[in-house]
Amino acid sequence: MVNVSVLSPVDDKKARLKHLIQRLPNLPGVYKMLGKNGDILYVGKAKSLKSRVNSYFAKTIDHPKTRALVARIHNIETIITRSETEALLLEQNLIKEYRPPYNVLLRDDKSYLYVFISADQPYPRLAYGRGKVNHQKGCFFGPFPSAHAAKETLVLMQKMFQMRQCTNTFFKQRKRPCLEYQIKRCRAPCVGLVSAEEYSEDVNNTIRFLKGDSSDIHSALIEKMEASAEELDFEKAVFYRDQLSMLREVQAKQAVYTVQGEADVIAIASQVGMTCVNVLTVRGGRVLGGKNYFPDVDSSQPLADNLSAFITSFYFQVTDDLPAEIMLSHELPDQVAVSEALASHFGSKVVIKTNVREHRAEWLDLAKLNTNNALKTKLGDYLELHARFGALKDVLADITDRTIDRIECFDISHTMGEATIGGCVVFDQSGSRRRDYRQYAIHDIVGGDDYAAMKQVLTRRYKKQPLPDLLLIDGGKGQLGIAKEVLTELGMLGDTLLIGVAKGEGRKAGLEVLHFIDHEPLDLPMDSKALHLLMHIRDEAHRFAITAHRKKRDKRRSSSVLEVIPGLGEKRRRDLLNHFGGLQQLLGASQQELAGVQGIGPILAKTVYKVLHE
């Protein structure tokens, strides 16, 4: 591996870059596009460095992101590698290290969810979480492409096999069964209501089911049900009968996926400049679910090239699980190199296929169908959003010639001045930018003073952040005046368009009035696409702010009554809530039960009981 940095003495940027490219080798390697200050804008890999880098400067480049990247390039550095596989691995390592802005291929790079069964306790716990937690010993099952799929599996396992889900701390402190036992989702091993042997059977059945081996469970449950009935232990017989009934119901739903196998099935499609990739996850012969991605790629490029870029980003940056097979809708131009790089990165062999038959062909057809449907829906939403932005531009034509691309909207939420939260949501012409959403906890104001809250939020945000093209305030002239005051103090007035959206006559939805600083209020018809856009953004700001407020309020209310008790610190408060499962259960506890909690004792228990029941 050789580092090459070609710096030309030529001053003119265009000529200098052309001179630089001419001197690049026709060898595999990695290239780094550098900005004016030496910052890394983009990292890529190539079979031939000279050909790949030269392609960025072709006159036929149409993708706006690529054109924007090329306009910012001031220098190019390359690293020669021994093979294309080595280049691919190095590319992904550099992307992880530097996070270049133009390498953002996948917006949603959360790690996938796994169902986990612990192995370091006599009564193992069933749980789920993102990624494989290295320090935890046990069995991981997945990945599940959505939180819904993981939670649904967890609930199903609870109903069928009744394993505990509580934390180890909560488990150790129990003196009586919790609510999960009452609703038949746990057999209460914490208080000895199930033997270690019986619980171990439930654990083994859960593991077998998650591995896709439910036929053995079916036979074993029939045997146990019949044996319990012969021994006149009808309670156990009913328990096994219920498990058997639920298992049959699940098997009937999943009969189409009874073939064994672990695979990721990936299909790509493109239409009108938009690209969609569907990843279908198959584990133990069962489809666990699918997830759609809309990577920011140049849709004019061949689908196979974009699929190759997606796959390397997906397996190196998003998931930490490599199945035995990857089935693709298109054959990759660098399929061998990708396969070798994945095998090297994960330490296990993977087979990449495009020509598949029988059930694998059905999986691939399913992925293609999901891709096309998701693309159609997303494209429809995008075109509608684009039309709404266009309508807004027309409505504001007499007020501003500013291009409206980024819109930020603020809302204040509280309950009679309690737990005041300011919420900020962000939209552009591609939709909501959830990663840019922010919530602000409001301090040091008179409770219920919305003007003071809005002033604090706007000041805190725009002291550090640049202004959007349009700043939307949920409120009328009063809130708009506060926004004007803040921007004046920050020396930013005039750098953005300020609009206040207030409910019109009778405060009815659809009769909103737009307020401006230097223009008369504007009433838009109820069918106005511009009004629909602003109402949608305003409603999203309200939803975001009120959700954050309720969460903060409920958390404060659940702990505030305990905070006034002398001698009850944060750890003891947490222990009490964990032990009884919440404030309501704590209120129903006797003084003796309170004293039984570790660290409380009879004296403190008396004080706690007295305060809670005054």
Curated annotation (Swiss-Prot):
Pfam families on file: GIY-YIG, HHH_2, UVR, UvrC_RNaseH, UvrC_RNaseH_dom
Domain GIY-YIG: 26-104
BP terms from Gene Ontology: nucleotide-excision repair; SOS response
Tagged with keyword DNA damage: yes
Domain UVR: 215-250
Main location: cytoplasm
Alphabetical keyword list: Cytoplasm, DNA damage, DNA excision, DNA repair, Excision nuclease, SOS response
Subcellular location: Cytoplasm
One of the record's GO cellular component terms: cytoplasm
GO MF annotation, one: DNA binding
InterPro entries, per database record: DisA/LigA_HHH, GIY-YIG_endonuc, GIY-YIG_endonuc_sf, GIY-YIG_UvrC_Cho, RuvA_2-like, UVR_dom, UVR_dom_sf, UvrABC_protein_C
HAMAP family: UvrC
Protein function: The UvrABC repair system catalyzes the recognition and processing of DNA lesions. UvrC both incises the 5' and 3' sides of the lesion. The N-terminal half is responsible for the 3' incision and the C-terminal half is responsible for the 5' incision.
Family per similarity comment: Belongs to the UvrC family.
Assembly and binders: Interacts with UvrB in an incision complex.
Protein name: UvrABC system protein C
